[in-house]
Amino acid sequence: MSLFRTIPTPGDFAPLFRLLDDYDNHRSARGHASVQSFAPRFDVRESNEAYHLDGELPGIPQSNIDIEFTDPQTLVIKGRSEREYHSSSDDNKNDQADTENQARGESSEVAKTGEKQVSTKKAANKSRYWVSERSVGEFQRTFTFPTRVNQDDVKASLKDGILSLVVPKAVPPTAKKITIQ
């Protein structure tokens, strides 16, 4: 029997709460597997003349990225990332051998149904993911600038997976005095 009573502190339960949160996040992510989305990371800095945005979009072709202004001070960057894999040389050799065998009529996987021949291809080398850390699916980021910007002179470039934008600030309107005649 203990002489001192131990009172649990909120920090004692932190690992348990983290575990429950991870489980909840995992379950909710599986339910929405049909439409995956993510927000790419951006660095935003301001100079005297412009705003500079640099975002990580690795492996996304330029044709899958849309940049537009939704209002005078709001810029939206959106697009789609797809998972693509290139088969290894062994896979290419197997595919070429299968194609050559089928061309010569040596396919061992032909089933005759009446007068029709139905050839069944081997199931493609289906892979099972052990870890899936790449961001795949739709993405969108919205940036609202605190000052007016010159939409006509925005410059964007995509190099080595980094999308760089230069959004020049608009020249502040000057007061114009009108003389009365």
Curated annotation (Swiss-Prot):
The keyword GTP-binding does not apply. Residues 33-181 form the sHSP domain. Residues 79-115 have a biased composition (Basic and acidic residues). Keywords: Stress response. GO terms for biological process: cellular response to farnesol; cellular response to heat. The keyword rRNA-binding does not apply. Residues 79-127 are annotated as: Disordered. Belongs to the small heat shock protein (HSP20) family. PANTHER family: HEAT-SHOCK PROTEIN 20 FAMILY MEMBER (PTHR11527). This is 30 kDa heat shock protein. It comes from Emericella nidulans (strain FGSC A4 / ATCC 38163 / CBS 112.46 / NRRL 194 / M139) (Aspergillus nidulans). The gene is hsp30.
